[in-house]
């Protein structure tokens, strides 16, 4: 749940801009000691929201028969007469989640034909850490390492908040197993996901 602070500075009222994913709610805290405020999501776009200082407020999706594109922007304003110039913005993203965990088989020395989406959603930029891999060949010989997801492979984070893909050219025949940690720009964390790919 994300807090949205309502503040006043030199006579200007500001509704804090926040970024959330679709699994999160928001709540408003009025820190303006001079006046009350009542944020309301734009009725022509997203419908009304509860009044400030409630325990939680659901941010609805656009009224459309189709799923909204992500990320999308929810705009709202104060519904108190005379306060219509007080507006706020909520950036809404898909949750950070694991994508494909069993990757399509690949051939040694051949570039992966299409990048494989291993992480979806979240807010870019992404921070990737703790990459660990193990490759087991057809004779049972094991190669372990860290700092990458395996010989010839790499993680490619997107800049448009769509997630992370695997690209590259595998250089070892065998089964690649790897894991890594991802943190996104709004503080979401994804870890302890096991991925695998067979290379012939």
Where does each model-flagged region fall?
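Extracytoplasmic copper-binding redox domains, predominantly the cupredoxin/blue-copper superfamily
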Residues: 1-111, 118-127, 134, 151-156, ...
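Aromatic sugar-binding surface patches on proteins
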Residues: 53-55, 160-165
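Extracellular/luminal low-complexity segments enriched in Ser/Thr/Pro
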Residues: 61, 66, 165-173
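Disulfide-braced loops of extracellular cysteine-rich modules
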Residues: 147-149
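Short, low-complexity Ser/Thr-rich regulatory SLiMs
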Residues: 157-159, 170
């Amino acid at each position: 749940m994300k807090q949205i602070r309502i503040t006043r500075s030199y006579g200007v009222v500001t509704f804090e801009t926040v970024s959330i994913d679709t699994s999160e709610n928001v709540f408003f805290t009025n820190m303006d000691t001079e006046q009350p405020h009542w944020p309301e999501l734009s009725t022509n776009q997203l419908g009304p929201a509860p009044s400030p200082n409630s325990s939680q407020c659901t941010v609805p999706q656009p009224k459309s028969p189709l799923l909204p594109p992500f990320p999308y922007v929810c705009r709202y304003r104060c519904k108190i007469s005379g306060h219509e110039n007080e507006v706020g913005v909520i950036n809404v993203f898909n949750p950070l989640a694991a994508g494909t965990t069993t990757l399509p088989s690949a051939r040694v020395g051949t570039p992966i034909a299409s990048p494989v989406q291993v992480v979806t959603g979240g807010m870019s930029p992404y921070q990737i850490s703790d990459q660990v891999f193990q490759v087991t060949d057809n004779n049972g010989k094991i190669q372990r390492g860290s700092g990458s997801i395996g010989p010839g492979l790499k993680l490619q984070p997107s800049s448009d908040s769509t997630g992370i893909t695997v690209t590259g050219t595998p250089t070892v025949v065998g089964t690649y197993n790897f894991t890594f940690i991802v943190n996104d720009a709004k503080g979401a964390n994804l870890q302890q996901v096991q991925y695998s790919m067979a290379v012939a």
